[in-house]
Each structure stands twice: as structure tokens, then as C-alpha cells.
């Protein structure tokens, strides 16, 4: 019977390991922050180009950024969120706009 208990313990250990390995990844909010210089049209362009929003939804989010100071553009895994933040910030700098994109844990 000792062997049966060993197998049960092993099975439980495997289940625990698999459960831990299959936990959903941490998610992060990608946020655009308002400033007084970036044109609204550029913000709409960013939302369409990097977040695949249609012009209507991009306009709604741009207005949220403008009037509320910031808006969530999407929620992604850490790697995707970090990549989007870096791409948006790089694109803004290349176009000489101070638009800031950040991330925070969801």
C-alpha cells in the first residue's frame, strides 16, 4: 500500500505543477496620457495604427484621453503591452509629439 500512496502523492504533485504552469498570464493596461501639444488627429492615427480601432472608436478614445486625461487603449499580456508602449512612444517621438503611452497591471 505504500506504493499506492506514493503514486497518489506523485499524481497530486503533477496536478499541482500543471495547474501552476497553466495559470493565465498577468495582464497589463496600455494607457495613453493627454498632453497639451499632440494633435487629436495624431492620437486617432496612433489608435488605428497600433490598436486596430476603426475611426469611430479611435475618435471616442481620443476624446476620453483629451477630456479625462488618459484612456485605456487595451489590456494585453506583459510582452504585448510592453511592445505596444514602446512602439507608440517611438512613433510619437519620430513625429515630434510628446504623446505618452504607459502600462500598468490590470
From Swiss-Prot:
InterPro entries: ClpS, ClpS_core, Ribosomal_bL12_C/ClpS-like. Gene3D superfamilies: 3.30.1390.10. GO terms for biological process: protein catabolic process; proteolysis. Pfam families: ClpS. Involved in the modulation of the specificity of the ClpAP-mediated ATP-dependent protein degradation. Binds to the N-terminal domain of the chaperone ClpA. PANTHER family: ATP-DEPENDENT CLP PROTEASE ADAPTER PROTEIN CLPS (PTHR33473:SF19), ATP-DEPENDENT CLP PROTEASE ADAPTER PROTEIN CLPS1, CHLOROPLASTIC (PTHR33473). Belongs to the ClpS family. This is ATP-dependent Clp protease adapter protein ClpS. The lineage of its organism: Bacteria, Pseudomonadati, Pseudomonadota, Gammaproteobacteria, Enterobacterales. The gene is clpS.
